Regions:
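Generic helix N-cap/helix-start motif at coil->alpha-helix transitions
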Residues: 1-5, 29-34
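The canonical alpha-helical register within tetratricopeptide repeats
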Residues: 20-23, 27, 56
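TPR/TPR-like (Sel1-like) alpha-helical repeat modules
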Residues: 29-31, 43-63
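Alpha-solenoid helical repeat scaffolds
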Residues: 35-36, 70
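Terminal, low-structured helical/coil segments at or just beyond the last alpha-helical repeat
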Residues: 66-80
Length: 80
């Protein structure tokens, strides 16, 4: 895991740059990157793909957060 890159992905997502954030998340396969990837597909509205990535996290679920901003802030907090 590259914590700096993943933090950058979260910041980009928070700033609304879905594509740039997604490109970073795709480059990593650890549970934090998978969680970011899941949230990005939740933002996109692709429920099936989002749940696919949630299944590859350390226990996070699609239903755990209704507010994606709050979820991204939680990921950011964990990465610090």
């Amino acid at each position: 895991m590259n914590k700096d890159a993943l933090m950058n992905a979260v910041n980009l997502a928070l700033d609304g740059d879905w594509d740039a954030s997604h490109k970073i998340a795709q480059d990593y396969s650890d549970t934090s990157a998978n969680w970011i990837h899941a949230v990005l597909h939740k933002i996109e509205g692709d429920v099936w793909n989002s749940k696919y990535w949630y299944a590859r996290t350390a226990g996070s679920r699609y239903e755990d957060f209704t507010d994606v901003r709050e979820e991204l802030l939680e990921i950011q907090r964990i990465l610090k």
